[in-house]
């Protein structure tokens, strides 16, 4: 019985403590701001198409397009859906019809992601984390704080447990996302992935030669990747660092120090930047989701004070 009580207290302490309703509302706003940039970056290729161009059949439609019978692309529709996506994201930020806005964002992402993946013939996974977060926002009462909805209607105050569980679930999902990526690597390639002359070296070479070579025999792009591929000793060191941080990522859930958390996540950001430069793994903007690991109330207050001071300044008239 004592052991069960201990487990129960630990469960409650982890999932239902630590955040206020204000924290949840601010997280919705800041994540929404990050999504504005993320959407544009992810769907830039779709937006380069001629909006009044001809319809094109998908050679390999994504599974849910196939299920719904969507067989071809209407260029103008993608632009309409993108405009709706950005409008709904702004609605999410402002807290205007919050749940409806979040639901529209999710549906628009499904459509535009389906278009992009059906063209490329490959399923991209960069929206996995943001989509899980949007789903948890949808289930939560995040639209009742720091929102237009809260000015229109009167809501009862959010209890600590109501504000904490969505954020803690987001944290847990992100931590396990990195942890399970190690399991996925080992399942696909075995421990060879983390050897100096294994899978990483192969990917580096492929990424460096994918753009071809000049007439002089020089690589058109990513020559740094090719140079690194010739150094299996360095690859071994980097691969072990990646192994350590991915296996150890769940430990961030128990780190109380804000500075230590920020230091760890800074290293993860450097990892994503390096992966983008060397291996063209395009998770470059995903670090905006790391805001879930911080209480944004003091950060927001600090920004309000300093931003207000900045806008209060006026250029002096010379002469």
For the regions a protein language model found, what residue spans apply to each?
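Alpha-helical membrane-anchoring segments
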Residues: 1-319
């Amino acid at each position: 019985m004592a052991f069960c009580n201990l487990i129960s207290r630990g469960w409650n302490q982890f999932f239902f403590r630590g955040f206020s309703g204000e924290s949840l509302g601010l997280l919705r706003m800041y994540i929404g701001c990050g999504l504005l940039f993320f959407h544009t970056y992810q769907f830039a290729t779709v937006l380069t198409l001629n909006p009044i161009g001809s319809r094109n059949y998908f050679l390999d439609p994504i599974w849910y397009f196939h299920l719904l019978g969507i067989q071809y692309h209407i260029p103008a529709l993608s632009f309409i859906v993108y405009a709706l996506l950005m409008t709904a994201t702004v609605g999410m930020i402002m807290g205007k019809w919050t749940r409806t806005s979040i639901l529209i964002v999710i549906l628009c992402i499904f459509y535009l992601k389906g278009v992009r993946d059906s063209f490329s013939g490959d399923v991209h996974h960069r929206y996995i984390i943001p989509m899980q977060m949007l789903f948890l926002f949808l289930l939560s009462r995040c639209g009742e704080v720091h929102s237009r909805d809260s000015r229109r209607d009167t809501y009862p105050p959010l209890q600590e447990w109501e504000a904490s569980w969505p954020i803690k679930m987001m944290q847990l999902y992100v931590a396990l996302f990195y942890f399970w990526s190690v399991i996925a690597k080992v399942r696909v390639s075995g421990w060879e992935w983390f050897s100096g002359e294994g899978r990483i070296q192969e990917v580096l070479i492929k990424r460096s030669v994918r753009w071809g070579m000049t007439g002089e025999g020089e690589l058109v792009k990513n020559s740094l990747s090719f140079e690194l591929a010739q150094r299996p000793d360095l690859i071994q060191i980097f691969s072990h660092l990646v192994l350590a941080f991915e296996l150890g990522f769940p430990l961030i859930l128990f780190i109380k120090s804000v500075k230590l958390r920020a230091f760890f996540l800074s290293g993860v950001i450097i990892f994503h930047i390096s992966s983008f430069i060397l291996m063209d793994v395009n998770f470059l903007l995903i670090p905006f989701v790391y805001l879930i690991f911080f209480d944004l109330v003091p950060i927001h207050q600090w920004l309000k004070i300093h931003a207000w001071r900045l806008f209060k300044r006026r250029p002096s008239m010379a002469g």
